[in-house]
Regions:
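C-terminal motif of bacterial Sec signal peptides marking the signal peptidase cleavage site
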Residues: 18-20
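Signature of long, low-cysteine stretches enriched in small and polar/charged residues
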Residues: 74, 81-132, 238-298, 313
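Bacterial N-terminal signal peptides that target proteins for export
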Residues: 1-9
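Short Lys/Arg-enriched alpha/beta "domain-start" segment
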Residues: 36-70
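Bacterial signal peptide processing site
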Residues: 22-25
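Proline-anchored loop/turn motifs at beta-strand termini and strand-loop-strand connectors
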Residues: 177-193
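Surface-exposed amphipathic alpha-helical segments
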Residues: 135-159, 187, 299-341
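A short acidic-to-branched-hydrophobic micro-motif
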Residues: 42-45, 204-233
Length: 341
């Protein structure tokens, strides 16, 4: 009898969980689309706190300089909205930080939620009993807050790329390296060899490029050391990315030393290179970002490099767009996995 009751309880719990899940899916499906421009964050906070220590730490954290751009640009553009003005017009914004400072707060902390008033939306709430606690919470959670906002923007761009994908390009890249990023509509295959592919999107006054290449692992050499990575990149650029005139080709700029970080994203371990590029014997240049990782069998090094040329415009958003393509890389599914799908 006890076993029957226990089984019935489990069934009821499962049914309730399924119903709750379905209700949440229905709720999200009915939400309006987000508003606001990419890289913009609404900060809901009182004017005094915005102009005081809390606003200062938010600006220092979120408006810090975006790394490795030719000119200064902030990580995010912050827009202050007082609590009284936070109406439905602002509630559908893509990125929202609500700073709730009240002596009634008994559990200080930072809460993260998605799709509260619109979709796909990120809402971050800082609850604190006073301004000093709010400042401390923001400092302690700064890296997570930035990561959440960056991932939200990246996920939106990847979702769009998958929805409007140039599948013929992915097929070519798959054949060369066994996987591919997702290229959104408008990108074209510009150059292809056995170990190098150049994909480009070239609207007026802007060029966004993705370079995909591979080279063999040399036994006994640390292929992922900064020195090895930068040397391989320089060689590839000189051999495969010519400029507009004779004896011109892409190089890494000496204006700023490239940075190398080792990261992991969705199970893929890679080295991230950020820096500036220029054209030898010419006056073109811009930012780039690369992800470098091993092939599944460990016999080859694979590189995905996104770069931007936009002399008339700010570069941050253009770079984030090509970076999202690089982040969207997935290994090709085998036949058995395709059958399951």
């Amino acid at each position: 009898m006890k076993r029957i009751i226990r089984n019935l309880a489990l069934v009821c719990a499962a049914v309730l969980a399924l119903a709750s899940c379905n209700q949440e899916k229905t709720r999200k499906a009915l939400l309006p689309n987000i508003t606001g421009t990419a890289g913009e964050v609404i900060v809901v906070i009182g004017q005094n706190d915005w102009e005081g220590a809390v606003g200062t730490v938010l600006r220092d954290s979120l408006s810090r300089e975006f790394p490795q751009l030719p000119q200064r640009e902030p990580m995010f553009n912050l827009v202050n909205v007082p609590q009284a003005a936070f109406t439905s017009m602002f509630q559908v914004h893509r990125n929202i930080i609500v700073v709730n400072i009240s002596k009634d707060v008994t559990e200080p902390g930072v809460l993260y939620r998605n799709d509260v008033w619109a979709a796909p939306q990120t809402v971050i709430r800082v609850n604190a009993p006073d301004s000093e606690t709010a400042v401390q919470l923001i400092k302690e959670n700064c890296t997570i807050i930035i990561g959440m906002l960056e991932e939200a923007e990246r996920a939106r761009m990847i979702r769009n790329a998958k929805k409007y994908e140039e599948r013929n390009i992915a097929t070519a890249v798959n054949e060369m390296v066994g996987g591919s990023p997702h290229f959104p509509s408008g990108y074209k295959l510009k150059k292809r060899t056995d170990d190098f592919i150049w994909v480009s999107y070239d609207p007026e006054y802007v060029s966004q490029g993705i370079l995909i290449y591979k080279y063999p692992v040399v036994e006994g050499e640390d292929m992922m050391s900064p020195e090895s990575l930068l040397a391989a990149n320089s060689k590839m650029l000189m051999e495969n990315v010519p400029g507009m005139f004779e004896n011109t080709y892409m190089i890494m700029s000496s204006y700023a030393q490239p940075t190398v970080k080792y990261m992991k994203y969705h199970g893929l371990q890679f080295a991230e290179i950020r820096g500036l590029w220029e054209v030898h014997n010419d006056y073109m240049g811009g930012p780039f970002v690369s992800h470098v990782f091993y092939s599944p069998d460990g016999q080859e090094v694979i590189v995905l490099q996104g770069f931007v040329y936009a002399p008339k415009y700010d570069k941050r958003q253009y770079l984030r767009q090509v970076e999202s393509i690089v982040y969207s890389f997935e290994w090709a599914k085998n036949e058995k996995e395709n059958e399951k799908d």
